[in-house]
Curated annotation (Swiss-Prot):
<dbReference type="GO" id="GO:0002250">
    <property type="term" value="P:adaptive immune response"/>
</dbReference>
<feature type="topological domain" description="Cytoplasmic">
    <location>
        <begin position="392"/>
        <end position="397"/>
    </location>
</feature>
<dbReference type="InterPro" id="IPR036179">
    <property type="entry name" value="Ig-like_dom_sf"/>
</dbReference>
<dbReference type="GO" id="GO:0007155">
    <property type="term" value="P:cell adhesion"/>
</dbReference>
<dbReference type="InterPro" id="IPR013783">
    <property type="entry name" value="Ig-like_fold"/>
</dbReference>
<dbReference type="InterPro" id="IPR007110">
    <property type="entry name" value="Ig-like_dom"/>
</dbReference>
<dbReference type="Pfam" id="PF05790">
    <property type="entry name" value="C2-set"/>
</dbReference>
<keyword id="KW-0564">Palmitate</keyword>
<feature type="glycosylation site" description="N-linked (GlcNAc...) asparagine">
    <location>
        <position position="269"/>
    </location>
</feature>
<dbReference type="InterPro" id="IPR003598">
    <property type="entry name" value="Ig_sub2"/>
</dbReference>
<dbReference type="GO" id="GO:0009986">
    <property type="term" value="C:cell surface"/>
</dbReference>
<dbReference type="GO" id="GO:0015026">
    <property type="term" value="F:coreceptor activity"/>
</dbReference>
<feature type="glycosylation site" description="N-linked (GlcNAc...) asparagine">
    <location>
        <position position="298"/>
    </location>
</feature>
<feature type="transmembrane region" description="Helical">
    <location>
        <begin position="370"/>
        <end position="391"/>
    </location>
</feature>
<keyword id="KW-0393">Immunoglobulin domain</keyword>
<feature type="disulfide bond">
    <location>
        <begin position="301"/>
        <end position="343"/>
    </location>
</feature>
<keyword id="KW-1064">Adaptive immunity</keyword>
Length: 397
């Protein structure tokens, strides 16, 4: 039994017992001649394989009389007979085809269905291995739900029939962003860069996209920017005035927010709809903003935006242990010492965001010159009055 792949080429072997250029014939199960040798020439019969068969003439003198069938079809599956040296050799050919349901370019989250074409009477099994090493088994239909970005690449599928196997290679492209979610940490006032790299490359890439943003302080989300994508070039269709985002003109998709401000902190969802594809690509992006301030005798450190409850916010004097550290979005210190203070947002000891603020020494409030003059005048008047009374008393006595 020989297993072949639809659209591929197969070689059925037939060998003579001696190295000779004897006559040979290949026939199908109905005894119709397919090809053979007459003298030193290759001859062909009126079979349906006439235009798709050949033989290696260079091996005839070695007693090798193979038949090559090109562009295999499922209906080519049958028993073929080689007649040579008054003997007959039978070779059973089974042709299988394995194809993706509709397209080999699928969006992340969509399902992949592989369908096996097989000849009547066969009972094959299929086992596929994904690029990320996941094994899937099935019969004539094999389904893979919820494709992940890591499923993009070459799938290796083995079809088995009567202990014989044939291997298929199918290239699947999962259309997705490289990251499902990302978080940007910035100090108040810093410029913010958002990047949305794709996990695939296509020669022609056309579509449209939009970024919706839900600020932490806002009651509802709003569209910050819409854009078109044509042949890997990006053009902005509409952008809000506050904030006024800037967008790169080439891939990867790139957005710039001029300043990180507390009222911008929040999360966004960038969607990309590709031409001729059902559904959209999604990537979530988060912005966390930190502010460190001193007001009168109070030093405060705050963060805005989506943060994990596990994150720690700390205030510490430079080169000293943290004065305060807890899992909260705001911490403060009363009457801080002078010096450089650090506001730190950390995850299991790893600093994600840092902001420094210098606390200056506090001096006693200086007495104003006018106050000194007034006090001096009052003291002089009191002294003069006292002396006058003293001398008046003495005069009476």
């Amino acid at each position: 039994v020989v297993l072949g792949k639809k659209g591929d080429t197969v070689e059925l072997t037939c060998n003579a017992s001696q190295k000779t250029t004897t006559q040979f014939h290949w026939k199908n199960s109905n005894q119709m001649k397919i090809l053979g040798k007459q003298g030193s020439f290759l001859t062909k019969g009126p079979s349906k394989l006439r235009d798709r068969t050949d033989s290696r003439k260079s091996l005839w003198d070695q007693g090798c009389f193979s038949m090559i069938i090109k562009n295999l079809k499922i209906e080519d599956s049958e028993t073929y007979i080689c007649e040579v040296e008054d003997k007959k050799e039978e070779v059973e050919l089974l042709v299988f085809g394995l194809t993706a349901n509709s397209d080999t370019h699928l969006l992340q989250g969509q399902s992949l269905t592989l369908t096996l074409e097989s000849p009547p009477g066969s009972s094959p099994s299929v086992k596929c291995r994904s690029p990320r090493g996941k094994n899937i088994q099935g019969g004539r239909t094999l389904s893979v739900p919820q494709l992940e970005r890591q499923d993009s690449g070459t799938w290796t599928c083995t079809v088995s029939q009567d202990q014989n196997t044939v291997e298929f290679k199918i290239d699947i492209v999962v259309l997705a962003f490289q990251k499902a979610s990302s978080t940007v940490y910035k100090k108040e006032g810093e410029q913010v860069e958002f990047s949305f790299p794709l996990a695939f490359t296509l020669e022609k890439l056309t579509g449209s996209g939009e970024l919706w943003w839900q600020a932490e302080r806002a009651s509802s989300s709003k569209s910050w920017i819409t854009f078109d994508l044509k042949n890997k070039e990006v053009s902005v269709k509409r952008v809000t005035q506050d904030p006024k985002l800037q967008m790169g003109e080439k891939l990867p998709l790139h957005l710039t927010l001029p300043q990180a401000l507390p009222h911008y902190a929040g999360s966004g969802n960038l969607t990309l709809a590709l031409e001729a594809k059902t559904g959209k690509l999604h990537q979530e992006v988060n912005l966390v903003v930190m502010r460190a301030t001193q007001f009168q005798e109070n030093l405060t450190c705050e963060v805005w935006g989506p943060t994990s409850p596990k994150l720690t916010l700390s205030l510490k004097l430079e080169n000293k242990e943290a004065t305060i550290s807890k899992q909260a979005k705001a911490v403060w210190v009363l009457n801080p010492e002078e010096g450089m203070w650090q506001c730190l947002l950390s995850d299991s000891g790893q600093v994600l965001l840092e902001s420094n603020i210098k606390v200056l020494p506090t001096w006693p409030t200086p007495v104003q010159p006018m106050a000194l003059i007034v006090l001096g005048g009052v003291a002089g008047l009191l002294l003069f009055t006292g002396l006058g009374i003293f001398f008046c008393v003495r005069c009476r006595h």
